[in-house]
Amino acid sequence: MDVNASKVDPKLLELLVCPLTKGRLSYDPEANELVSEKARLAYPIRDGVPIMLISEARKIEE
């Protein structure tokens, strides 16, 4: 894991949902992203702040 990567507070992770599906998110520490498996999107975390904009999310390819 990158030393500069931030950790996500588990309580925050319980509150945040995918803006598209309203489903749960999981934290990917290697990519420092919040992942919506249902929407197949990964939301970046920049300077410790989750960017919960669909337009900023990375599409997850299989």
UniProtKB/Swiss-Prot annotation:
Residues annotated as transmembrane: none
GO cellular component: cytosol
InterPro entries: Trm112-like
Pfam families per record: Trm112p
UniProt similarity note: Belongs to the UPF0434 family.
PANTHER family: PROTEIN PREY, MITOCHONDRIAL, ZGC:162634
Name this protein carries in UniProt: UPF0434 protein Smed_3047
Organism of provenance: Sinorhizobium medicae (strain WSM419) (Ensifer medicae)
